[in-house]
Amino acid sequence: MPVLVSNLQGKVAVDEALTGLLTRAAQEVLKAEGYGEEAEVSLVFVDDAYIHGLNRQYRGVDAPTDVLSFAMQEGEPLAGGEEELILGDVVISLQAAERQAGEYGHSLQREAAYLAVHGVLHLLGYDHQGEEERKIMRRKEEEVLGRLNLTR
């Protein structure tokens, strides 16, 4: 289950422990949802200005956000080579993660892992527009975070 990590920002320190945790978080979601070793996602770390531009361009929202998911194809993953299943990209503003961690009283690691889990679930088609969808998605997020020992 390859998880490709790119750090396109320099405002929040990124070390191997953080990238390792977020890689495991993404892999835990994929395992929980029945994906095999061929499933691949990318995690891209950016700052608020970068994600603001993406949010404006792709969602028509002129404000920064914490996480955006870009599925390779809406509704279904894109098959890569014979042994690849490329699901898409999860773009995380580490500036937002750091700020929200302070607001919620937990670590950057916990907040960034939550955003990674949330983003990968979006890649897999989960949403939180309605109350029932929100409950399902929240339960799945908490299950994965619990397996990583990252509870509130």
Swiss-Prot record:
InterPro entries: MetalPrtase_cat_dom_sf_prd, YbeY, YbeY_CS. One of its GO terms (biological process) is rRNA processing. Its EC number is 3.1.-.-. Binds 1 zinc ion. Belongs to the endoribonuclease YbeY family. Zn(2+) binds at residues 118, 122, 128. SUPFAM superfamilies: Metalloproteases ('zincins'), catalytic domain (SSF55486). One of its GO terms (cellular component) is cytoplasm. Single strand-specific metallo-endoribonuclease involved in late-stage 70S ribosome quality control and in maturation of the 3' terminus of the 16S rRNA. The lineage of its organism: Bacteria, Bacillati, Bacillota, Clostridia, Eubacteriales. Its main location: cytoplasm. One of its GO terms (molecular function) is metalloendopeptidase activity. Pfam families: YbeY. It is found in: Cytoplasm. It comes from the Bacteria. It is an enzyme of class 3 (hydrolase). Its cofactor is Zn(2+). This is Endoribonuclease YbeY. The keyword Membrane does not apply. Keywords: Cytoplasm, Endonuclease, Hydrolase, Metal-binding, Nuclease, Ribosome biogenesis, rRNA processing, Zinc.
